């Protein structure tokens, strides 16, 4: 029997199957794009900083004397810097008549030079001496480690903590960089709180390093409610995460994440990573699964799909310090994606195998009033294959995404301090590709993580960027918590297809501005709210559901 609905459904399904690859670039969700939407940008790493107390010896107290002639200054005890470098710091004192206090000031120049160049406990002194022929002797004491003692009260095995401190050895000159790296790597270990003290050693010129490790909570986590979903799989979402710190006593981390909008979207991920050595090298593995059903305007299609991702990675901190950090990671991802339209029995099943090499880092500087920089760069090389002949043929006749692909991604941000209460935040994210990409690899623009004036996943493409400027003002803290107001401007541009295969518009630009309010309350409650409206003309290919878009996130950590 003839029913008018069937031709309509067939036309809608054909449109859905090809829309993600067309020049319009508007995103009708599938397994690939939804998988990207539910994974927000990774926040900057903020590990617990170790507590370090330094107990210094007081300055040498020598009796005052009358001025005397200084013809030459001799220096001894230095090994980190050559004598000529240190002598240049005090050479202007030669050929003058100086008091002992003035000689101490000359020695302090060398002390400060050592401190500025990573030797926090080194000092130069004018020892008791008999001045003959105007020759004054300045002695450099390059502080060395005496005892290095570890008092482990955490649940991490002693051998792993000992290996992390192994680069620091008795009789070794104390340098700030080496000490910072070892103590920060200790503090990076899940389940560990680090307290360290440097005390004067028993031998002259030595300091003992006493390190105490205490346990941190065995489990941490949080729950969050937001409206960050898209209109096809449900806007309101509830998510949660649970981390088991040091679950097997080897500095390991077991993480569980879930996210759901009800029956239309369900996502779960389990990940485990552990330390391989005392230098912060980590090996990790993860498995995630996703199931979706399209509703709203596309409910009649009975469209649904799944995604499964298996990941393996190896990471290494190359630089670890309070003011600069650099991490490297190599990751392998195997993704299986399934998009089905049951009404027309259309199936698009595919898989990808990809390798990702990435560098991530941060720096703190004193430019203007000071700021924090975060950056990351990654290169992905992969292979896409289809699991059914019909989907493979459709791809070959259109976007031709099957086969080898590669892409570059970059993220840059800076938080500039303007005053005690004001800050300026700048960020840029970009992607470049060598060929047409599957939606799971494309750049998505629109939503709370990019251009907030547009719906989640408004446009997508093989290449593009989005950038943000935010002016943040922190209000006076009250017993109700800390409030922060935000004014922002977002803009993004997408090139839909690297290799154009269909006539029509192949790019889109989205811009918008808005205001926001952030709240950090007691008991680790946080709220983030943004309201934004588009600027300029909205691309015709982008669906519009109103001129104002609002985003809300409510979270509770424990």
Placement of each model-derived feature along the sequence:
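Membrane-embedded beta-strand positions of outer-membrane beta-barrel proteins
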Residues: 221-223, 242, 254-258, 283-287, ...
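Periplasmic polypeptide-binding modules associated with outer-membrane biogenesis and secretion
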Residues: 4, 24-229, 241, 258-266, ...
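Transmembrane beta-strand segments that form the barrel wall of outer-membrane beta-barrel proteins
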Residues: 219-229, 240, 250-262, 268-270, ...
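Transmembrane beta-strands of outer-membrane beta-barrel pores
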Residues: 227-229, 246, 258-262, 287-293, ...
């Amino acid at each position: 029997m003839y029913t008018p609905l069937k031709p309509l459904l067939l036309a809608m399904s054909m449109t859905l199957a090809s829309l993600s690859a067309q020049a319009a670039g508007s995103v009708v969700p599938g397994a690939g794009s939804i998988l990207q939407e539910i994974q927000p940008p990774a926040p900057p790493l903020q590990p617990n900083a170790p507590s370090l107390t330094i107990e210094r010896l007081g300055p040498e107290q020598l009796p005052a004397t009358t001025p005397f002639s200084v013809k030459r200054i001799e220096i001894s005890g230095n090994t980190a810097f050559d004598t000529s470098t240190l002598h240049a710091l005090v050479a202007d004192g030669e050929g003058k008549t100086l008091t002992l206090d003035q000689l101490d000031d000359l020695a302090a120049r060398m002390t400060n030079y050592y401190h500025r160049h990573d030797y926090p406990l080194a000092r130069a002194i004018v020892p008791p001496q008999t001045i003959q022929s105007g020759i004054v002797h300045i002695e450099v004491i390059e502080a060395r480690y005496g005892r290095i003692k570890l008092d482990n009260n955490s649940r991490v095995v002693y051998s792993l903590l000992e290996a992390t401190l192994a680069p620091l050895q008795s009789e070794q000159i104390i340098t700030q960089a080496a000490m910072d790296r070892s103590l920060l790597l200790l503090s990076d270990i899940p389940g560990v709180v680090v307290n360290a003290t440097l005390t004067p050693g028993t031998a002259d010129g030595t300091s003992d390093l006493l390190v105490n490790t205490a346990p941190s909570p065995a489990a941490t986590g949080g729950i969050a409610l937001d409206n960050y979903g898209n209109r096809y799989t449900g806007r309101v979402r509830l998510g949660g995460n649970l981390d088991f710190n040091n679950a097997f006593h080897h500095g390991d981390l077991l993480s569980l994440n879930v996210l759901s909008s009800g029956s239309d979207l369900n996502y779960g991920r389990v990940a485990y990573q552990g330390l391989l050595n005392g230098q912060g090298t980590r090996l990790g593995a993860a498995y995630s699964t996703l199931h979706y059903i399209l509703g709203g305007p596309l409910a009649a299609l009975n469209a649904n799909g799944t995604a499964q991702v298996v990941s393996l990675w190896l990471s290494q901190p190359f630089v670890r310090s309070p003011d600069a950090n650099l991490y490297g990671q190599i990751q392998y991802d195997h993704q299986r994606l399934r998009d089905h339209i049951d009404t027309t029995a259309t199936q698009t099943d595919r898989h990808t195998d990809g390798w990702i090499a990435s560098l991530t880092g941060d720096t703190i500087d004193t430019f203007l009033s000071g700021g924090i920089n975060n950056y990351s760069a990654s290169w992905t090389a992969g292979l896409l294959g289809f699991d059914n002949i019909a989907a493979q043929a459709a791809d070959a006749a259109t976007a031709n995404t099957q086969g080898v692909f590669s892409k570059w991604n970059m993220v840059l941000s800076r938080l500039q301090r303007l005053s005690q209460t004001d800050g300026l935040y700048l960020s840029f994210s970009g992607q470049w590709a060598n060929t047409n990409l599957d939606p799971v690899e494309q750049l998505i623009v629109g939503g709370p993580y990019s251009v907030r004036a547009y719906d989640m996943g408004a446009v997508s493409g093989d290449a593009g960027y989005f950038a943000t400027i935010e002016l943040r003002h922190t209000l006076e803290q009250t017993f109700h918590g800390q409030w922060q107001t935000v004014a922002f401007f977002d803009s993004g541009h997408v090139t839909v297809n690297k290799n154009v295969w269909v006539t029509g518009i192949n790019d889109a630009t989205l811009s918008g501005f808005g205001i926001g309010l952030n709240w950090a309350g007691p008991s680790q409650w946080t709220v983030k709210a943004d309201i934004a409206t588009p600027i300029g003309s909205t691309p015709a290919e982008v669906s519009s559901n109103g001129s104002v878009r609002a985003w809300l996130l409510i979270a509770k950590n424990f």
